[in-house]
Amino acid sequence: MVTIRLARGGSKKRPFYHLTVTDSRNARDGRFVERIGFFNPVASGAEVKLSVDQERAAYWLGQGAQPSERVAHLLKEAAKATA
């Protein structure tokens, strides 16, 4: 099953996540099909907290990809911010 989930990056105590489309059997930070955005939970000031390619996210959801709980919340938040 294809899922849209977060892959952790960044450094210790400073997380940074990529929104990735991947096969659910792959490791969290392992192989992915496509990166469709990022989420920076510790962004401050002028830093961008969330960026999502809405067009690609809609495409993958249309193809049957299942978003994780957190990603579903982030996609809703990103759609609200662009509207």
Swiss-Prot record:
Highest taxon above the source species: Bacteria
Keyword Ribosomal protein: yes
Keywords for this protein: Ribonucleoprotein, Ribosomal protein
InterPro entries attached to this UniProt entry: Ribosomal_bS16, Ribosomal_bS16_dom_sf
GO cellular-component term (any): cytoplasm
Keyword field contains Chaperone: no
Alphabetized GO MF terms: structural constituent of ribosome
Biological process, per Gene Ontology: translation
Record-linked HAMAP family: Ribosomal_bS16
NCBIfam families named among the record's database cross-references: S16 (TIGR00002)
Family statement drawn from the similarity comment of this UniProt entry: Belongs to the bacterial ribosomal protein bS16 family.
Protein name (record): Small ribosomal subunit protein bS16
Organism: Azotobacter vinelandii (strain DJ / ATCC BAA-1303)
Taxon lineage: Bacteria, Pseudomonadati, Pseudomonadota, Gammaproteobacteria, Pseudomonadales
